[in-house]
């Protein structure tokens, strides 16, 4: 394989630029030509494809977002959109594609592979909801951003003896809430993967105040409900504390990536090129026990929440390895 392309798709994540940089520089070192596809699959269909050099990706490793830009393009789910994109790839002599993004992006990569264009997925999403990898690019930065914000909220919460509900991102996965909640010593961590009762939370808040506690921090994953709705239901369940709600929002998707995300993105980008060089497509790279791995895209493009609830109320473990990591971390924090 002599000519490949790289694109970013879906929601942006800190570290995407580091991954692009690794793809470009690794490919050049292997004697390949590299093209950047701007604006994701929409740009592929529109022919927004330009050659990239080592200079093109200079000084981007520390930048958040993606310099290739990103866009959601549901039309690529249709065969007509796929064929238009493939026509553009052929026009530029491209033989393989690295797709950086989340589960929706992976579905597009799978379609490309089915049409004879090897595509390798690189997990770029702050949600950490991709099966087959312990961590996704951007997750560590998002957790760090949430942690910093919650630390600041704790200062004002304690000053005014208030209860704060802090809503963090993560879509249908509670990973950001779990890790940020542990890191900030939150009083309650509410995630989609685990049930809860408002009455029990209210009782816990009341007991805390009776024991001399000055304030409370509740970290809420957006996949459960909005912070406003949660606050209203908490009040309806009998909470009488001075309650405030905060939605951290898109600040979690921005900012300079952490060292961990930069290194992770660099390793994943380079590994994706190694796979394409061997003619391997239809797979997504990941990290397991600090080692690079690859898994069939078909299995990794499903929802990657750690747990889900069955109709009988039992917890189903969707990703045992990630669940073990999270639960062991939670258990350690409780025992400290």
From Swiss-Prot:
Highest taxon of source: Bacteria
GO MF annotation: an example: 6-phosphofructokinase activity
Annotated ATP binding sites: 11, 72-73, 102-105
This protein's record includes keyword Nucleotide-binding: yes
UniProt-annotated binding residues for substrate: 125-127, 162, 169-171, 222, 244, 250-253
NCBIfam families: PFKA_ATP (TIGR02482), PRK03202.1 (NF002872)
Name this polypeptide is given: ATP-dependent 6-phosphofructokinase
Organism of this sequence: Streptococcus gordonii (strain Challis / ATCC 35105 / BCRC 15272 / CH1 / DL1 / V288)
Gene: pfkA
């Amino acid at each position: 394989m002599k000519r490949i392309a790289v694109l970013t798709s879906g929601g942006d994540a800190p570290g995407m630029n580091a991954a692009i940089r690794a793809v470009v520089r690794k490919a050049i070192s292997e004697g390949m030509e590299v093209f950047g596809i701007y604006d994701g699959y929409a740009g592929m269909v529109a022919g927004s494809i330009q050659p990239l050099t080592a200079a093109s990706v200079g000084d981007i490793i520390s930048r958040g977002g993606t310099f290739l830009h990103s866009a959601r393009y549901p039309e690529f789910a249709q065969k007509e959109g796929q064929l238009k994109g493939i026509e553009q790839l052929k026009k530029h002599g491209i033989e393989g594609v690295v797709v950086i993004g989340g589960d929706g992006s992976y579905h597009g990569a799978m379609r490309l592979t089915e049409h004879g264009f090897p595509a390798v997925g690189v997990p770029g999403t702050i949600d950490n909801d991709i099966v087959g990898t312990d961590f996704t690019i951007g997750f560590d930065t998002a957790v760090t951003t949430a942690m910093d914000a919650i630390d600041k909220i704790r200062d004002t919460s304690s000053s005014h003896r208030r209860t704060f509900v802090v809503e963090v991102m993560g879509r249908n996965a509670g990973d950001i809430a779990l890790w940020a909640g542990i890191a900030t010593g939150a009083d309650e961590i509410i995630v989609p993967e685990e049930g809860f009762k408002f009455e029990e939370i209210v009782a816990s808040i009341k007991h805390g105040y009776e024991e001399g506690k000055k304030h409370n921090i509740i970290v809420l994953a957006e996949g459960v409900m909005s912070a406003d709705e949660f606050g209203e239901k908490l009040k309806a369940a009998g909470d009488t504390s001075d309650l405030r709600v905060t939605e951290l929002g898109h600040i979690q998707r921005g900012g300079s990536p952490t060292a961990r995300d930069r290194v992770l993105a660099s390793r994943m980008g380079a590994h994706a090129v190694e796979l394409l060089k061997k003619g391997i497509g239809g797979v997504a790279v990941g990290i397991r026990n600090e080692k690079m791995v690859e898994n069939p895209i078909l299995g990794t493009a499903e929802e990657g929440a750690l747990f889900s609830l069955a109709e009988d109320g039992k917890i189903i473990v969707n990703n045992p390895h990630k669940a073990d990591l999270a639960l062991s971390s939670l258990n350690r924090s409780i025992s400290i």
